From Swiss-Prot:
It comes from Bos taurus. GO terms for biological process: ADP biosynthetic process; AMP metabolic process; ATP metabolic process; nucleoside triphosphate biosynthetic process. This is Adenylate kinase isoenzyme 1. Residues 131-141 are annotated as: LID. Transmembrane segments: none annotated. It is found in: Cytoplasm. Its main location: cytoplasm. Consists of three domains, a large central CORE domain and two small peripheral domains, NMPbind and LID, which undergo movements during catalysis. The LID domain closes over the site of phosphoryl transfer upon ATP binding. Assembling and dissambling the active center during each catalytic cycle provides an effective means to prevent ATP hydrolysis. AMP binds at residues 39, 44, 65-67, 94-97, 101, 138, 149. ATP binds at residues 18-23, 132, 177. SUPFAM superfamilies: P-loop containing nucleoside triphosphate hydrolases.
Length: 194
């Protein structure tokens, strides 16, 4: 299993809130048959499963604390091991959020093939999030909160991008255009992996 994970394509997908990375991940799954793993979704699924690990996570999250890195990695690893035989590769969405997370992932799972950086400017992301807020009812889609989320995102992500740029595996896509325009850039990078 270890060997299989080391040979499979693993793509970290990084982009700010409202950059459109979720949409791009869906399109990649449809076209390339990759498995889309979002740490947020994995955590939520574990909590609602009512497992022992889920109960522990629920308590941590209710206190507003960060879930331990080890737990997140165990969940990612379990999800990858479960799918490694049938998947063409993995999209790890919104991870790593800091350099240490990336290093731990490599130590415990495998090295990423590349980091796809879905890059939209702060004005674009804000506009998209406010638009989404009109229909989503998500409490975190208001201007004040969006500003804070973007600040947090930039502070956390810049060192991660720099870390992987040194290795030459960052592929940046300009996410200002239409969904299809952005996806054609994504395809160029993914097609080059074959």
């Amino acid at each position: 299993m270890e060997e299989k994970l080391k040979k499979t394509k693993i793509i970290f997908v990084v982009g700010g809130p409202g950059s459109g990375k979720g949409t791009q991940c869906e399109k990649i799954v449809q076209k390339y048959g990759y498995t889309h793993l979002s740490t947020g979704d994995l955590l939520r699924a574990e909590v609602s499963s009512g497992s022992a690990r889920g109960k522990m996570l629920s308590e941590i999250m209710e206190k507003g604390q960060l879930v331990p890195l080890e737990t997140v990695l165990d969940m990612l690893r379990d999800a990858m091991v479960a799918k490694v035989d049938t998947s063409k590769g993995f999209l790890i969405d919104g991870y790593p959020r800091e350099v240490q997370q990336g290093e731990e992932f490599e130590r415990r799972i495998a090295q990423p093939t590349l980091l796809l950086y879905v890059d939209a400017g702060p004005e674009t992301m804000t506009k998209r999030l406010l638009k989404r807020g009109e229909t989503s009812g998500r409490v975190d889609d208001n201007e004040e909160t969006i500003k804070k989320r973007l600040e947090t995102y930039y502070k956390a992500t810049e060192p991660v991008i720099a870390f992987y740029e040194k290795r030459g595996i960052v592929r940046k896509v300009n996410a200002e255009g239409s969904v299809d325009n952005v996806f054609s850039q994504v395809c160029t990078h993914l097609d080059a992996l074959k």
